[in-house]
């Protein structure tokens, strides 16, 4: 009688363990796919991501550049107006030279806005591509779960361990689905911001001709655009170190314990912590870039 009951408890525990393995492997496949999408998008140019959106952004930039040419003259005149103390003093050699240099620099940057914008994109993409090979988003927990089940010394513990694994696997799969979606959205949102930001550079850069009083508009655009460009590098760094940093700590916890419950907690931590860490870094990538660049 008790032998049959023990076999039943062991069988139910094994079924729960097998279900948890299947659920976690499915979640692992989802996370791996999300990581592959992120790596591919981080190493893809905005033109390669959506050629139609890039074409629209280019047309809009050319339109804004025509307006920017007029703004260049306007900001120069406004800067001249605010800098002069009297009409006679405004034509001194030092004033004329200073305003001439300011206008020449502003005009040169204005004419090179598209080149600078695409150059920053290309450079940030090369940085991200260099880290792509070191990014790993895969995991396999089959042996870990089976090892924990083998540590259960009684049928009751065997059943409880399998049941705990099943509940943890369900919760873990829900978390994986959420963070995978957030990770993909964080990367795709960057392209949308780039498509919007690039055309407005043609309107912001001419403010340099107005001097300190108006140049904050241009510097604001440069800070924002640089943050959009280089945040993919932060995303790739987050993906590269998250699994090694947090996953290694959780795996160390698993490897030094013979308690099934601790192994369950360590297994879930080895899956969830790298993901949540990576998503947190990706969501704050722009602010991290600004802090690193002193913006």
Label every model-predicted segment.
Residues 33-64, 84, 110-145:
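Internal transmembrane helix-loop-helix hairpins in multi-pass membrane proteins, together
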Residues 206-223, 288-292:
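Alpha-helical transmembrane segments
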Residues 1-71:
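Binding/recognition "hotspot" determinant
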Residues 59-63, 92-99, 162, 166, ...:
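Hydrophobic, aromatic-rich alpha-helical transmembrane segments
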Residues 12, 16, 20, 104-200, ...:
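Non-cytosolic segments of integral membrane proteins
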Residues 65-77, 168-176:
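Hydrophobic alpha-helical transmembrane segments
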Residues 71-107, 200-215:
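Hydrophobic transmembrane alpha-helix segments characteristic of membrane transport
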Residues 1, 5-20, 93-113, 218-229:
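Alpha-helical transmembrane segments and their helix-start/interface "positive-inside/aromatic belt" motifs
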